[in-house]
Amino acid sequence: MAVEQFPRKKVSRPHTEITVDTSGIGGSSSSSDKTLMLVGSAKGGKPDTVYRFRNYQQAKQVLRSGDLLDAIELAWNASDVNTASAGDILAVRVEDAKNATLTKGGLTFASTIYGVDANEIQVALEDNNLTHTKRLTVAFSKDGYKKVFDNLGKIFSIQYKGSEAQANFTIAQDSISKKATTLTLNVGSEPESTTEVMKYELGQGVYSETNVLVSAINSLPDWEAKFFPIGDKNLPTDALEAVTKVDVKTEAVFVGALAGDIAKQLEYNDYVTVAVDATKPVEDFELTNLTGGSDGTAPESWANKFPLLANEGGYYLVPLTDKQAVHSEALAFVKDRTDNGDPMRIIVGGGTNETVEESITRATNLRDPRASLVGFSGTRKMDDGRLLKLPGYMMASQIAGIASGLEVGEAITFKHFNVTSVDRVFESSQLDMLNESGVISIEFVRNRTLTAFRVVQDVTTYNDKSDPVKNEMSVGEANDFLVSELKIELDNNFIGTKVIDTSASLIKNFIQSFLDNKKRAREIQDYTPEEVQVVLEGDVASISMTVMPIRSLNKITVQLVYKQQILTA
C-alpha cells in the first residue's frame, strides 16, 4: 500500500492536511493550467530574472538565440498532429552575462541586451538647429534598428500677459542632488523689486508632474503656459533645469529639462535605458558604441537558479542541460516545493545519441515519481529553416510542451511528436526495456494514412507499475491538482472559522459538493457519497473518502475470429 501526505512537510500552524491512499488505483483529472518552466542558456535576457512569455516574438526579442529560445519554440510546436502545446512559459537564463554601457557627462546609457551583441548598440546626442533642441539617436544594425528622438530639451513655455512692467520666473534646485525644488512666478514695476505671485513645490505632492504644473499656471490671471508642440513632455517636475529671474514679459520662454526629456523618451525603449546624474552637465557626442557586454558562462551548479521560480505558479520544470548533477539539483528543488504544498515535476533529458544503457543508468540515478527522463535525441527543422540537432534535454522541452498543453490527467502516451529524424531508431525489445526502466521514448509508426513518431508512454523514473500515481506522469499530475485544489478549498472555507459554526455534516456536504463538481467536469470518474466520513473533535476535523479517478487507457486486447464462408448454388 502506498500512502502520500500533502503537504508532506509538517507544520504546527493552522492548516489542512490530506492523506492519499494510492494502493487501489491512480488518479486523473482534466482542464487545468500547467505552466512550463525552462532554465538554460541564451544570448539575451537578464541573468537570474524570471520572464513570462506568451508568444515567440516576445521571447525572441528578449532571449535572441540559444537553447532557451529553441526550447520555447519546441514547446509551442511540439506535435504535428495533436493541438496540445505549452501555454505561458517561464524562462530563466543561467549565464553570468553583462550588459553594455556608455557614460557621457550626466547620462549613463545601458543596454537591455545582456551579451556581446550589446556592444554593437550605438548612441548619439546632437543639436537640432531648426528647433534649437537636441536630437538623440539609438542604432543597432544587427537588428536593423535605428530610432531618432528629436526636439528634446524644451518642455513648456511661460509668458506673462498682464499690465505689470516686469515679470519673470525662477526655478531653484537642491544644492546636493541638483533636482528642482521650486518654481516661482514674480511680477513688479522694476526688475529689482518684483513680488512673488505664486510658488510651486516641485518633485513631490500636487505638482510632481508637469501637466499639473502647466494647468496650475494657466489658472492664474495674466499667465500662460504651453507645452512644446512635439513629443510627450509630461516629465517629473524635479527634472526641470534651474534658472534665475528669466524675463517672460516680452515673449514666451521655454523651461528646459534635457536630461529628464531623454529619460522620458527612453523609458520604454527595447534596446537602451538611461540613468541621469543631475550633478553633471549633459554633453553632445557623436555616434558611439556601448561597451562592456559579455555572454558570460553557464555555472557548474544551477542550485541558485531554480528557487527563482518558487512562487511563479509553474508546474513542469525542464533544465536545459545533460549534466546529471544539475538534474539532481532540479529534483531537490521540485521535491522541496512539493513538500511545502506547491507540487511540481521535472522532465530531463540526456545528451546526443545516447545508448539504451546510458538512458537506463540516468533513470536509475534519478528514480523519483516526480522525475521523468527523455531517452532519445534527433534532428528537427525549425521555423526559420535551420535543421537543428537536438540532444535529449531539448527533446525534454518538447515532451514538456505536450504535457503542459494537455488537460490535467491526460497522458502523453501515443501523442504524435514533431521531429525530422532520431539519432537511434530503437527496436521493439529496446523500447520495452526503456519503458520498463522508466525512460520516455518515441517509436516510429506507419500506416496507409500516416507516417509519424509517437510517444511510447508517460512513465516516470520511479519505475513501479504497482503504483500508477508514482509510475505514470499523468496520473501523478492529476493527483497533484485534485489534492492541492481540495486543500485550498478547505483552507478557504473552514480553517480559522469558529467550531461552533462548523458541523461535521456541513463539512461532509461541502466535500460531496466538491466531488460532484469534479465528476461533472469529468475530472474524477465517480465517488461514493456514503463513504465520505467526517469526524469533528475539538479543533481537528478528520475526513475520509473514496474516489474513483479517471485513468488513461494503456492497453487494448482484441480477439478476432475468422470463419470460412461456404458458397453453394
Curated annotation (Swiss-Prot):
The entry's localization annotation reads:
Virion
Q: Which domain of life is it from?
A: Viruses
Region feature (Disordered): 1-32
Main localization of the protein described in the UniProt heading: virion
A Gene Ontology CC term for this entry?
virion component
Q: What is this protein called?
A: Putative tail sheath protein
UniProt keyword annotations, A-Z: Virion
